């Protein structure tokens, strides 16, 4: 089934070239079917890239999905045009009255700052509190996961001695959970972060279950027992070249950065990396949409 997007969204042409089933709003409204309403709080600096990456995964499910893009009203983006934000994004006061079947809170390049020092932290906490009553299930990604764990459960983040950067293998801690249906016993996922959460802190919270871990990258996937809050410390949505672009960006800035682990063929940055995580990324999003959003949301919100 298709993902429904605004008619002129730049990601539409890219997705159609990749054979992703997309449908503009005019055609979608003519179908007699209850679509899922998903809101994406996009905190990534390169918003158009993040849009394409997430829509690619949302569009690979058998469910029709309506997407609303949300941005912080208390932060001015320096890397996305004002025209793009005004045309395709809304702000929280305009949607706080609505109910959504699902929400995605993306990562953000602010992980080395204390949460309370982030310019839009107060607004983000208001949104995260709102998800408790107005969203069936919320998927938090990377820094978004750390922010969610901190706000909802008081779990802190810790600086890493070296950036967690590369493609890492993960194992399943719980094999009979719906979110991991169809997963191999070992799967790969990109990580790109300077901070971490500790397993022992999460295990102290009886309302949380650790679903997947990596020997090198640590805790990967955590879920609240009611499925309303999902926390993902990696970036399954990343393109094959995203880590390469981040690596080259940091090199150009003279920042201390190591070659992404298990990423370039033979650790040679001149060779094109392969996407070895795509299938499980798609499976994760399909499982989330089906079992945690579609199966749990009411047909008509009260």
UniProtKB/Swiss-Prot annotation:
Q: Which GO terms describe its cellular component?
A: cytoplasm
Q: Indicate the annotated site residue(s) for Important for substrate specificity.
A: 192
Protein name, UniProt field: Homoserine O-acetyltransferase
Q: Which pathway does the database say it acts in?
A: Amino-acid biosynthesis; L-methionine biosynthesis via de novo pathway; O-acetyl-L-homoserine from L-homoserine: step 1/1
Active site feature: 142, 235, 237
Keywords attached to this Swiss-Prot or TrEMBL record, sorted alphabetically, are:
Acyltransferase, Amino-acid biosynthesis, Cytoplasm, Methionine biosynthesis, Transferase
Enumerate the catalysed reactions.
L-homoserine + acetyl-CoA = O-acetyl-L-homoserine + CoA
Q: Note the HAMAP family from the entry.
A: MetA_acyltransf
Q: Which GO terms describe its biological process?
A: L-methionine biosynthetic process from homoserine via O-succinyl-L-homoserine and cystathionine
Q: What EC number(s) does its UniProt record assign?
A: 2.3.1.31
Q: Does the UniProt entry include the keyword Transferase?
A: yes
Where can this protein be found?
Cytoplasm
Question: Which superkingdom heads the taxonomic lineage of this protein's source?
Answer: Bacteria
| Entry-linked Gene3D superfamilies | 3.40.50.880
For the site Important for acyl-CoA specificity, which positions are given? 111
**Molecular function GO labels:** homoserine O-acetyltransferase activity; homoserine O-succinyltransferase activity
Q: Which family does the similarity line name?
A: Belongs to the MetA family.
Keyword Lipid biosynthesis listed: no
Its chief place of residence is cytoplasm
Task: Return the InterPro entries for the record.
Answer: Class_I_gatase-like, HST_MetA, MetA_family
Q: What does this protein do?
A: Transfers an acetyl group from acetyl-CoA to L-homoserine, forming acetyl-L-homoserine.
């Amino acid at each position: 089934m298709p993902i429904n997007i605004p008619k002129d969204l730049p990601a539409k042409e890219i997705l159609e070239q990749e054979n992703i089933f997309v449908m503009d709003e005019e055609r979608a409204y003519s179908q007699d079917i209850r679509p899922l309403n998903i809101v994406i709080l996009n905190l990534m600096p390169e918003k158009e890239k993040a849009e394409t990456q997430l829509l690619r995964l949302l569009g690979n499910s058998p469910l029709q999905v309506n997407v609303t893009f949300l941005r912080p009203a208390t932060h001015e983006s320096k890397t996305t045009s004002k025209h793009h934000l005004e045309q395709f994004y809304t702000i929280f006061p305009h949607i706080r009255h609505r109910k959504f079947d699902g929400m995605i809170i993306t990562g953000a390049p602010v992980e080395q700052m204390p949460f309370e020092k982030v310019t839009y932290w107060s607004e983000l906490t208001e949104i995260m509190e709102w998800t408790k009553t107005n969203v069936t299930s919320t998927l938090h990604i990377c820094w978004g996961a750390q922010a969610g764990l901190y706000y909802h459960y008081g779990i802190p983040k810790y600086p890493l001695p070296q950036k967690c950067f590369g493609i890492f293998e993960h194992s399943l801690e719980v094999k009979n959970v719906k979110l991991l249906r169809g997963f191999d016993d070992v799967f790969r996922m990109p990580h790109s972060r300077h901070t971490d959460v500790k397993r022992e802190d999460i295990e102290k919270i009886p309302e949380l279950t650790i679903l997947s871990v990596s020997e090198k990258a640590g805790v990967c996937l955590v879920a609240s027992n009611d499925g309303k809050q999902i926390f993902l410390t990696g970036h399954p949505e990343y393109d094959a070249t995203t880590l390469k672009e981040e690596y080259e960006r940091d090199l150009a800035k003279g920042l201390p950065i190591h070659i992404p682990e298990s990423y370039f063929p033979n650790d040679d940055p001149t060779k094109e990396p392969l996407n070895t995580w795509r299938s499980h990324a798609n499976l994760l999003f399909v499982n989330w949409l089906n079992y945690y959003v579609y199966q749990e949301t009411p047909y008509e919100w009260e």
